[in-house]
Amino acid sequence: MIKKEAPLIALVAGEISGDILGAGLINALKLHYPNARFIGVAGPRMIQAGCETLFDMEELAVMGLAEVVKHLPRLLKRRKQVIETMLAEKPDIFIGIDAPDFNLTVEEKLKASGIKTIHYVSPSVWAWRQNRVQKIARATNLVLAFLPFEKAFYDRFNVPCRFIGHTMADAIALKPNRSEACATLNLDETQRYLAILVGSRASEVRFLAEPFLKAAKILKQQYPDLQFLVPLVNDKRIAQFEQIKAQVAPELSVHILKGNARQAMIAAEASLLASGTAALEGMLCKSPMVVGYKMKAMTYWLAKRLVKTKYISLPNLLADEMLVPELIQDECNPENLAWYLGNYLADDADHRKQRNELKQRFTELHKLIQCDADAQAAQAVVDVLEANTSDQN
């Protein structure tokens, strides 16, 4: 039974992905509490859904150590402002959406003052810096996790966590429509395509564009009819990619797309991609993939010592087996990439059977994480909120 019909709900998002999650959560919460008031730090989608914002979310959207250091005084000032505002407003619940370096400290202060807190999107504590789980325990009443292995990790440490499924799994059809994807991209359906995703960060494009393009050149010799789709997130990445392409593969014809990664992976027979969210999206698009990743030698040396997981790509982590090849650092070379991709492009009966089996596994994993995450997240908030109000009555 709802004890408080017009709760004050605070949310802080720090980047575009968080704004999308926040808007979905607000709209789902309105079904439970039509008179709720939403305050915090919001992007355009959350504002449209009815959230009052203290300042522009863009101020928190900084990436990379150098950028964080440069903006640290402003970030600390904004964090202090959020904490002071929340302590004054005393919301019924505070929900930090991702942005753990900013939100966990806010959550810890608020929880200590008696405000219920939820952290939405688990930090990658299961992969590295596992000691952060102690801070998460101090800072939150509940963690909302996208993936089942994340909940299993928190269970080991007795930290309250609820698996809600992944919003991306809700957004992508179990059987993606290739004809529709080709029409959206203005592509000839009868052609064969390979999607090449070099990552969204400058450093990823710098390290991966060359081996990925050289692999494409090898494949073009083996499959002369093969065409290449290269979705890039913005004009900066497009310019960076074109500059590298002019040096390493000037004669190779590619379709450069601004955005549209999802449609490219649905239209393509296979994908070559950087590890990260793209691998999960590729799995949901049922795109057979090869995952490649390179970084600075020192970064790799550190990562090898810090990362605690058997796999780096989300499809393999979800399946707990090597479903798709992962080629890291020196193994991420054109010859290896082309060889593994060739297994997806070969047209004999054995390879076709392997591809169909892989797509079937992708579909099973899709079903596992397709749970209507917005509604699940809202229900979790309601449960924590009502435990709170019943405690007070």
From Swiss-Prot:
It comes from Actinobacillus pleuropneumoniae serotype 7 (strain AP76). GO terms for biological process: lipid A biosynthetic process. This is Lipid-A-disaccharide synthase. Keywords: Glycosyltransferase, Lipid A biosynthesis, Lipid biosynthesis, Lipid metabolism, Transferase. The keyword Glycosyltransferase applies. Its EC number is 2.4.1.182. HAMAP family: LpxB. It is an enzyme of class 2 (transferase). GO terms for molecular function: lipid-A-disaccharide synthase activity; phospholipid binding. The keyword Lipid metabolism applies. Pathway: Bacterial outer membrane biogenesis; LPS lipid A biosynthesis. Belongs to the LpxB family. The gene is lpxB. It catalyses: a lipid X + a UDP-2-N,3-O-bis[(3R)-3-hydroxyacyl]-alpha-D-glucosamine = a lipid A disaccharide + UDP + H(+). SUPFAM superfamilies: UDP-Glycosyltransferase/glycogen phosphorylase.
